[in-house]
Amino acid sequence: MISAALLWCLSAAAYAGNAVENPDSLALVNAEWNWKSIGKGGEAGSAKVKMFGSDQTISAVKYPAARFKTKILHCPGDESSTTDMLASRHGYTVGVNGSYFNMRTLEPCTFFAMNKSVISLTPKSEGFRTNGLLAFKKKNGREMEVLYCDSTKFDQYRKNYNMVIASGPVLIKDGDTGTFAQDKYFTEKRHPRTVVGQDAKGNYWFIVIDGRFPGVADGATIPETAAIARYFGLKDAINFDGGGSSTLWTEATGVINYPCDNKKYDHVGCRRVPNVIVAK
């Protein structure tokens, strides 16, 4: 039987096209991912890849949306904790950090609504990077949408979706790469990045690109992050909070990536966050 990981490699290789034209995509496909089952057809893997003229450490989880329940956990203020702790504490088997937040109050600072109630709104200062939404119509999270965010429609989003959170930028929408704000620090400088998205085969993907460890994990610009999502075969993808927040965890593997909040290249430098995307 061909494993799901091998099927991904074959499809990604086909998507990548000519090796001479696209060496970065083939470097991603040909890396040693060491995929591990997380149950119910889901897999987790991590690899060190030389691409974009840099050294990358990339971790990914993919799972069939129809066999998992996906949710956004809201744990602000004193309820906040690290991504791995929040996911495990609430009985989930997969977790990735969520959207932008106030690091002093540990409250979300982007539009966020659950169960028809608005939790927070996006201030104008966040508009340049928070141009998207991750939305789920059903409580079980089995219908994901990545949308461009219109701040005049927050009440409409609240009514139409069971869970919806603003983040960004949108990396890929319906197979098309997004247009990114020109910003030397956020967009054009390499940082740790977190990506949530879906492919055309019914799989949800959580991806973390580690950074701030030169020569091992250089991090990615926003255009490079979009390219990585595309190389994985995602048709829809959105960028979430990065930097020291970027954390990817599964019950089967523990923290997969190398969170940088402790400035050490290990698996324990996780930052407290107020919301996470989880699945079980």
Report the location of each language-model feature:
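Zymogen propeptides
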Residues: 15-139, 143-145
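Bacterial Sec-dependent N-terminal signal peptides
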Residues: 1-19
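Conserved, well-ordered active-site substructure
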Residues: 105-128, 181-198, 206-236, 245-280
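Structural recognition of the beta-strand scaffold that forms the well-ordered cores
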Residues: 93-97, 135, 197, 205-207, ...
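Short acidic-glycine loop/turn motifs at beta-strand connectors
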Residues: 64-66, 135-143, 173-175, 198-203, ...
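Short, solvent-exposed aromatic-acidic interface loops
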Residues: 75-80, 149-156, 209-214
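Conserved beta-alpha junction segments in alpha/beta enzyme cores
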Residues: 50, 162, 169-201
